């Protein structure tokens, strides 16, 4: 079972991640929400995590198209939980498997998506999107690396785990 598998694994905390809302910049809803917009530089340097940065009211995106990851994906689960916690039902136009695909489709202006700050800190800057902080604790998670307990850990893996991922 999945629960007993957890005890058969070892893990390493990779990083904390926070989901953000990525909205195509040409959506008119953005003009009414400028005080909530976060520059990509503040996402990359972590300043957006400050409690002084306000979360966007999700209901403002009520009639907009959303790109959501499937519910067997943690990001997809969290996106739906965030929506439920905010009494909001997204109008879903795409259900996808990967954050990167959702990001690329959002860049094309085809919908709003939930995206992690780890991905945003590693992709080239795209001026076609506007970013917003999400409300609640469901937008925050810890990312782990897992491996089977008792398995040989190669020198390459040891060195990889020592790398600074910030």
Label the model's feature ranges.
Residues 2-7:
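Short, small-residue-biased leader/transition segments that mark boundaries at the very start
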Residues 11-27, 34-44, 61, 134-142:
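Short Pro/Gly-enriched coil loops immediately N-terminal to beta-strands
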Residues 22, 67-69, 146:
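Short hydrophobic segments within beta-strands
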Residues 71-130:
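Hydrophobic hinge/microswitch elements
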């Amino acid at each position: 079972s999945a629960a007993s598998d957890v005890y058969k694994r070892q893990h390493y905390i990779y990083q904390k991640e926070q989901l953000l809302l990525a909205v195509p910049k040409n959506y008119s809803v953005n003009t009414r929400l400028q005080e909530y917009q976060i520059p990509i530089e503040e996402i990359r340097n972590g300043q957006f995590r400050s409690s002084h940065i306000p979360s966007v009211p999700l209901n403002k995106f009520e009639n907009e198209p959303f790109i959501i990851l499937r519910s067997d994906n943690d990001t997809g689960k969290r996106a739906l939980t965030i929506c439920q916690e905010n009494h909001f039902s997204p109008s879903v136009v795409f259900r996808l498997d990967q954050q990167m695909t959702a990001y690329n489709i959002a860049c094309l202006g085809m919908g709003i998506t939930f995206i992690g700050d780890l991905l945003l800190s590693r992709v080239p800057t795209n001026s076609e999107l506007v970013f917003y902080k999400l409300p609640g604790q469901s937008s925050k998670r810890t990312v782990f690396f897992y491996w089977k307990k008792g398995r040989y850990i190669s020198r390459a893996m040891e060195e990889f785990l020592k790398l600074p991922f910030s």
